[in-house]
A protein has these predicted regions:
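N-terminal glycine-/lysine-enriched basic segments
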Residues: 1-127
Length: 127
């Protein structure tokens, strides 16, 4: 029986990969933000045909990346979008863009110390 190989990343390399995934999703939805927001076209995973939308949660729902660590970053930000959509029914694009900025600030804060980041994000969530 062959045991599957697990890949582990840590430090700057892990942060860079996670941030790359976060940026890919945020860049995709940011252009749809506001009154002058643009449409995004993508291939639907369900119907395997092109789909056009300007809805951030639809774009987030369809987003997946092949690189596993970048995909983890994308999945983390998708959770923020889905929770916002569930609670408010709107604002997913704004939530994704703000979440990206929080992640970037957290990684810069204390060079990515996990305890400091958790405390800072928890403090922000209480506002």
């Amino acid at each position: 029986m062959k045991i599957p190989f697990k890949q582990y990343l840590y430090g700057k390399e892990a942060r860079d990969k996670l941030l790359a995934g976060v940026n890919k999703l945020a860049d995709s939805v940011a252009i749809t933000l506001g009154g002058k927001g643009r449409n995004v076209i993508f291939e639907s995973t369900i119907f395997q045909k092109p789909e056009v939308t300007c809805d951030g949660v639809t774009i987030a729902r369809e987003g997946n990346l092949e690189e596993p660590f970048e995909n983890m970053g994308m999945q983390l930000i998708k959770q923020a979008a889905f929770r916002t959509n569930d609670m408010a029914g709107d604002g997913t694009t704004t939530a994704i863009v703000l979440a990206r900025e929080l992640v970037k600030a957290a990684f810069e804060l204390d060079k990515g110390n996990p305890v400091t980041i958790k405390k800072a994000l928890y403090g922000i969530s209480l506002l």
